[in-house]
Design a protein with these regions (language model features):
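Short, low-complexity disordered leader/linker segments with a strong preference
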Residues: 1-40
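Immediate post-signal peptide segment of exported/extracytoplasmic ligand-binding proteins
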Residues: 30-42, 62-63, 159-168, 300-305
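Short, well-ordered beta-strand elements
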Residues: 37-50, 68-73, 165-171
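Ligand-binding cleft/hinge of the Venus flytrap
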Residues: 58-65, 158-167, 171, 175-194, ...
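Short helix-initiation/N-cap motifs at beta->coil->alpha
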Residues: 71-83, 194-206
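Ligand-binding "clamshell"
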Residues: 104-132, 210-212, 224-238
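A conserved helix-loop-strand patch within extracytoplasmic ligand-binding domains
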Residues: 113-169, 251, 270-274
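Periplasmic-binding protein-like
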Residues: 128-129, 135-142, 221-268
Length: 305
């Protein structure tokens, strides 16, 4: 996944435990049981809107539960943030399970979302990391174009693009070397005629609207896809894989933080449906709200902070 797939009584429990500590004279024994005594959770995010929202959701929920959190936003691509967590610069970040399997472990995409999660978790555990629960929503790379272009070319699936003599396809620079992007499109679908256009600061949707590209790498939770103006071609060969989000966390930090840590994170993940993520992505990307404000509103609405 290149970019792009937010939602306690724990706060009350923390307040109660704090009250007990005060009644007991603020004993050291009581204080060591509080989440605040756990190691600092160093959260990192990749370099796109959805990751900023996810990072804020986990950050704010953990802070509300009493954990100390350090936040490092916009680290970069999957490869860069993977280096950050394996080097110990961060110890937690949200990742897409298919990206772990295909782009980091360099394995073939499994045939189901559950198998993809299992393979991703097994890979991370060989490196001193692990995965917490995955989200209901998935956000995979997708082959997007203007609906008018799709109709003109007579295409509904990615495989149909084989009959198009030549076309341009835009994506982030790392798309060029990814199995879940241009490499897969060429090897699996045989789209060797595709001319790659690397994205810099301009949106793929802007390039589509201006007629500067034929198609581009979009994401299934992009708010723009709610408009009939754009069409996503069906990925019949599953090049883009299964891309549910699962927090990657250091095994040492997970053990030291105690069971409450995983409970808080998993409770947030469980609420992150496709409609919820599309709405939050829209609030940030189109309505120009900040990820922090959007995340706070979602957590409050779902009683997670």
């Amino acid at each position: 996944m290149i970019r792009k797939h937010t939602r306690r009584a724990a706060k009350a429990a923390f307040a109660i435990s704090l009250g007990v500590a005060i009644v007991l004279g603020g004993s050291a024994a009581a204080a060591t049981k509080r989440p605040a005594a756990a190691p600092t959770i160093v959260i990192g995010t990749k370099n796109f809107t959805e990751e900023f929202v996810l990072g804020q959701l986990y950050k704010q929920a953990l802070e509300a539960a009493g954990f100390k959190v350090s936040y490092d936003e916009n680290i970069g691509s999957s490869e860069l943030i993977d280096t950050a967590i394996t080097s110990g610069k961060i110890n937690f970040y949200p990742e897409y399970t298919g990206v772990i399997v295909q782009d980091l472990a360099h394995k073939t995409s499994p045939s189901t979302a559950a198998a993809t999660y299992a393979a991703a978790k097994a890979f991370e555990q060989t490196r001193g990391l692990t995965l917490l629960n995955s989200t209901p929503f998935y956000d995979s790379d997708s082959f997007g174009m203007l609906t008018s272009t799709a109709k003109k070319l007579g295409v509904t699936t990615i495989a149909d693009m084989k009959k198009v003599k030549s076309f341009s396809f835009a994506g982030y620079p790392e798309c060029r070397t990814r199995v879940t992007c241009l490499v897969g499109l060429k090897k699996v679908y045989g789209l060797t005629q595709a001319k790659f256009v690397p994205l810099a600061s301009i949106s793929v949707y802007t390039l589509l609207d201006e007629g500067k590209i034929t198609a581009g790498d979009v994401f299934s939770t992009d708010p723009q896809l709610g408009e009939s103006k754009y069409t996503v071609l069906t990925d019949t060969k599953h090049v883009f894989g299964f891309q549910n989000v699962a927090p990657v966390v250091s095994q040492k930090v997970l053990a030291a933080a105690g069971p409450k840590f995983a409970q808080v994170v998993n409770a947030v993940s469980a609420k992150l449906t496709i409609p919820a993520m599309i709405a939050m992505n829209k609030a940030v990307a189109i309505d120009k709200d900040t990820p922090a404000v959007v995340a706070a509103g979602f957590l409050k609405a779902n009683h997670l902070n």
